[in-house]
């Protein structure tokens, strides 16, 4: 059998049109109308040497929520939730960080944003499947990912190396651009997530400087145990990145990760973070702790704001689910699912069309950052 890639016409149409009006509720690559855990439309495309592509049914799977239904990632923040007593102080700090670092909040796409490769290791086929517009890569060969000491720690973390044994990395996968070179693999067959930080291939062998593995993700709250995971807080990319499918669908149904420039010292952080890379040697008062959650004031009329379509989608998610501080960066920023996740399957980079060709640093122009509200420390901790 000669397998060929059939790209969803629905998905391409959504990307071409900017994708913010919602997708078809049926068809081989329909984009789900909700982030709830529903059975997704799954198809596989294949052809013989002389025939037309034929759909091959596979087990229905939902990509919308890979962690426990009780995960903080998926729990809306009630409108009457208590606020942090330092909320207004933290909001002023956030505004100062934005103003003094380029005056904007960037949407990272190709750099400092992890690709997420969804794979199936028991697919029984070498055809790419499509689940609600997301490519699912069949992988028949597992590889061991080695450790390389990019931070000159002088030791090998053997427990981490053990977690990186037998990783189903699809052929042709690439990590993100930029110095962090992040990469995520999610195996739908086993509900296992791997993350890698500063990832590279040397003589055909994969290596990474840090990361981790989460098994049985449907039973996990969406937090790597200390000290694992590729973000500074141990919060996985797959929980808080924004996907092209979500923007095409017009709705984000989870909390969003946000990176700040400055944060409270490493020993002061909030659940759900399991650690922090904050650095405050001069003991500046009232720094925002990593792991803390914030939301856009739910009383703001988002539809009345002069926002881009994507900015409006993000603002509504910020009201309902909020942001969680998961990392530090050179500018305040959010992460999209890296377009390498789609390009491996033959799709173009979806973000220029979804952003209506607006630069990534201008997509959130007009966002009401002054209306952010910070939640109490350890908000929502079981």
For each feature predicted by the language model, list its residue ranges.
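Sec-dependent bacterial lipoprotein signal peptides
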Residues: 1-18
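Bacterial Sec-dependent N-terminal signal peptides
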Residues: 13-55
């Amino acid at each position: 059998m000669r397998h060929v890639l059939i790209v969803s016409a629905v998905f391409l149409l959504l990307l071409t049109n900017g994708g913010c009006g919602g997708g078809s509720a049926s068809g081989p690559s329909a984009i789900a109308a909700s982030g709830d855990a529903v059975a997704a439309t799954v198809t596989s495309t294949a052809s013989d040497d002389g025939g037309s592509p034929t759909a091959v049914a596979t087990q229905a799977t939902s990509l919308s929520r890979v962690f426990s239904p009780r995960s903080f990632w998926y729990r809306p923040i009630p409108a009457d939730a208590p606020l942090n007593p330092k909320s207004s102080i933290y909001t002023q700090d956030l505004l100062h960080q934005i103003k003094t670092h380029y005056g904007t909040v960037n949407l990272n796409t190709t750099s400092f944003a992890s690709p997420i490769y969804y794979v199936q290791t028991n697919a029984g086929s070498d055809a790419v499947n499509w689940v609600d517009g997301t490519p699912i890569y069949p992988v028949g060969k597992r590889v061991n990912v080695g450790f390389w000491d990019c931070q000159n720690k002088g030791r090998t973390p053997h427990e981490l190396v053990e977690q990186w044994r037998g990783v189903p990395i699809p052929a042709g996968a690439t990590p993100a651009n930029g110095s962090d070179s992040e990469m995520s693999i999610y195996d739908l067959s086993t509900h296992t997530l791997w993350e890698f930080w500063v990832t590279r291939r040397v003589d055909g062998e994969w290596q990474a400087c840090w990361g981790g593995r989460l098994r049985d993700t449907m039973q996990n709250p969406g937090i790597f145990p200390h000290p694992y995971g590729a973000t500074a807080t141990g919060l996985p990319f797959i929980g808080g990145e924004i996907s092209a499918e979500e923007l095409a669908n017009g709705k984000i149904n989870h909390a969003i990760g946000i990176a700040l420039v400055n944060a409270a010292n490493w020993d002061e952080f909030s659940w759900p973070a399991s650690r922090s890379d904050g650095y405050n040697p001069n003991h500046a008062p009232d720094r925002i702790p990593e792991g803390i959650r914030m939301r856009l004031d739910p009383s703001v009329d988002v539809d009345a704001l002069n926002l881009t379509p994507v900015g409006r989608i993000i603002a509504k998610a910020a009201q309902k689910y909020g942001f969680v501080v998961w990392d530090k960066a050179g500018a305040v920023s959010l992460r999209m699912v890296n377009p390498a996740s789609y390009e491996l399957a033959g799709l173009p980079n979806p973000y220029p069309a979804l952003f209506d060709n607006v630069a990534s640093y201008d997509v959130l122009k007009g966002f009401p950052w002054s209306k952010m509200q910070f939640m109490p420390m350890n908000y929502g901790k079981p």
